[in-house]
Amino acid sequence: LVILDFDDTGEYKIDNKNILKSLEFLFSKKNIAGIFANQLGTYYDMWTLRDEKYCKNDFWAEVLQNICAKVYPIDKISNQILEEVKDDYIKKKTYSFNINQEPINVHSAFGGFGIYKMENVLNNNRFYEGTQTVDLKFKDNTTTKTKFQKCEHVNFNFGFIDQNCELYILPYLINRDLMDLTFSPEIALKLIIKN
């Protein structure tokens, strides 16, 4: 199963040799269920990424939690707070994966292009899911919960982990030209689901 973003990332022509190399890797072990693309420069799909080294939890939910920890519940969020979160959290969680790096074992990824083994897709008991509840704690230690968007690929990808399968970002599987991308903390505020 091939999944591809149909925005500007999906327009990039992936090198045919790297697609073949990726398929060889995918089928090199029975327990590899899926492979995902990388980008030159900043890896742009932090929302989907879950692993033990780079991003254990939802990137944008953690951005929101970092914002809330710096304000009181009634405060307006200032540009200074947003800049602090950008410097203290986002910049530390912005990565580039060298094309010569070894495949990166992950719990979830996408990067605009992914290939899954159909056998594992058919055995996947999880579906695409786009909402979650996020716990928030403010500067005065008051807490609340909020409905928040969730990257739809994550739950689906966890279904492969449930099957004891492996997923990988392949650093050589490039699907975007060099781009120095920065993530804006305001995006986290836009992902709050208002009822």
Roles of regions detected by a PLM:
Residues 94-195:
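C-terminal catalytic/acceptor-binding lobe
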Residues 2-5:
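Short aromatic-hydrophobic micro-motifs that form the base-stacking/packing surface
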Residues 8-134:
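Conserved catalytic core of nucleotide-sugar-dependent glycosyltransferases
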